[in-house]
Every structure is written in C-alpha cells, then in structure tokens.
Amino acid sequence: MALSTHLQLLQQKRGTIKWEVKNMKILSILMCYLLGTILTGEIVTYIMTGESASKLGTSGNPGMANVMSHLGIIPGIIVLLGDILKCVCAMLIGYYFIDASKTGILIGGALCTIGHDFPFWRKFKGGKGVATTCSVIFIYGPMAGFISLIVGLLTVIVTKYLCVGAVVIPLIMIPFAFKNNLIDGLLMTGLTLLMFYKNYPQLSIIKTHQAEKNDIIAGLKNKLGHK
C-alpha cells in the first residue's frame, strides 16, 4: 500500500513538473513576441521629435534605415543596437526556456521578428525585421550568417535596392538550416517568406523603376560630408 501511494505521488509530481514546463514554454513564447514589439525606432523618434515614427518620411517605418535617413547616422545606429539587443534577449529566452539548441535560438529570434513586424499596440503595423532577422541568422550560424550578410550587403550595393538584399540574406541561410534539421529549415523558410511579404510592395515595383533606391556608399559620403 505504501509503495502504491509513493508511486502515485511520484506520478502526480511528474505531471505537475510537465505542466509547469509547458506553462514556462508558453510564457517564454509570449515574452519573445512581446520583446519584439518594443520598437526602438519609435522610442528614438519620439525622444528626438516628439512624434511617432509613423510620421517619418513616406513609409513611416520604425526601422533603422528610415530613422537614419531622416534623423541621422547616430539615431539610426541606436535603433540598430536596440533591435539587436531585444532579439538577442529573445534568442536567450528561446535557448534556455523553449529548447536548449539552435532550434530554440531560431524560435526565439523568429518570434521576436514577428513581434517587431506585427506589434499589437501599433495595429500590427511594425518594421520590416531586417535587423532582427540578421541578428538571428548571425547567432544561429556565425560563419554561414556572415557569408549571407556579406552577400546581402553586396546585393544592395550593386542593385541599390535594400528590399532585394533584405530577402537575399535569409534566403541564402535556408539550405544551412535544413542541413541542421527539418524544423530549423522550415523556420528559416518562414523568416524568408516573412521578409518577402514585408518587402513585397517595393519588390513589386522594381520593374517600373518606382521602387526606393538606397545608394549606401553615396549616402554615407553625403551624411559624413555634412559633419
């Protein structure tokens, strides 16, 4: 009888632990998304102008490129660092509380990117997730990530279209992710499709030469020349 009672208590304890672990994973998923909804671009823009980033330029994008274009290099760098920091925090949560592997890192980063792209408090109209996606890619696979970032940068320099380079970066990482495992490959494919979706308005008008061009080299020279 005592042994039977002891076994029942053990089973109940295991069930409680499983339930707690499940709840922790759900909470971690929510935290990763919520971290993504902290838009550094909105904070920096409000501090500098007293207005929302939605009023910056024609796009109203709270990302680094738009902030740098209208407010300067330093504010743009601050936005970049803020977006990288929140993504790193989300990836750490993913690793320690969702799955202690590269998959956990990818899940955390992907959720943060979704939060950045679709923040609930901004009527789900956020950034394009370029900085967060690049952060995920580099930490997920430093060597392959570095290569994809360089290729993406060269693509922007050659084509002068940021939207093209933004899609190329995660696209290159898909084979590397599938090589690791199926789930990682599907997650990386999802990030690529998300990047394509967020950049589709610009991609769709490239042929008509109406898409916004980004001459990085000329832009930097111009910015530095005004200092």
Where do the PLM segments sit?
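Nucleotide and nucleotide-moiety/phosphate-recognizing core
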Residues: 75-81, 85-119, 152-153, 160
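Short, non-helical or kinked segments that cap or interrupt transmembrane helices
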Residues: 51-61, 120-134, 161-168
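Short, Lys/Arg-enriched N-terminal segments with co-localized hydrophobic residues
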Residues: 11-23
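Core segments of transmembrane alpha-helices
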Residues: 79-93, 130-131, 145-150, 166-170, ...
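Helix-coil boundary and interhelical linker segments in multi-pass alpha-helical membrane proteins
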Residues: 21-29, 89-107, 138-144, 176-187
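N-terminal signal-anchor transmembrane alpha helix
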Residues: 24-49
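Interfacial segments of multi-pass membrane proteins
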Residues: 68-71, 94-97, 115, 130-159, ...
